[in-house]
Amino acid sequence: MPFRPVQPEKLSSAVVRQIEQLILRGILRPAERLPAERELAERMGVSRPSLRDAIKTLQESGLLTARPGAGIYVADVLGSGFAPALTQLFARHDEAIFDYLSFRRDMEGLAAERAARLGSDTDLAVVQTVFDKMAAAHSKSNSDEDAKLDAQFHMAIIEASHNVVMLHMMRSMYQLLRDGVFYNRQVMFKQRTTRQALLEQHRAINTALQRRDAHKARDAVRTHMDYVERALRDQQEAQRNEEIALQRLDHETTG
């Protein structure tokens, strides 16, 4: 876990700042469990009473939450990013779906450009590692795993951009996607030709990043998001056509 001994001062305040910083930088993630009190106090080099004071402060600020019998967790602050009524409205209207994709195209293109310029070698190694997992999983045809790695790949790029506002904003957007608000990614990954195209697009993004070619990285992301939008429109049209065909079949067999 990413905790360091703190400098002597008011220890509880130093603990609060360190944990806040880890949450701000996206290192500690929503719903992640903190180590047990004894272990965490030892790692941070503070007394358990000082740690308790810090945890209490962070709970009162809404950044940490206690689960009875389970421990202390990072609060799911992203869950409150969109009101339930708004997420339901998003889900019911195609306009929101394609605005979401347009937003991602712009933001992730910028993130890729920043990652190529500003990301550390370690940042890019993380991106490479996730892509390697994507490539290895390609032969397994597991749409759930594909969708999970897809999200990890894009988030690794956003993390490598080192903009904490963008990081938390995009995490909130990805949470909506994981919840199936906009569209079902698993359906897209079940199509063989689409899966192959998506893998090659991710390869192009990764290659540009590893070469630190900011412009190509941005363009590769935009090409990828354009493809996702076209695939989704085709998927929706195919679904509408199937509904019409079923109505015709029902009419022919019962008429």
Where are these regions (language model features)?
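Conserved amphipathic alpha-helical segments that form helical-bundle/coiled-coil interaction surfaces
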Residues: R104-Y183, Q201-T207, K216-R230, Q235
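Solvent-exposed loop and edge beta-strand segments that line ligand/cofactor-binding
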Residues: K190, T194
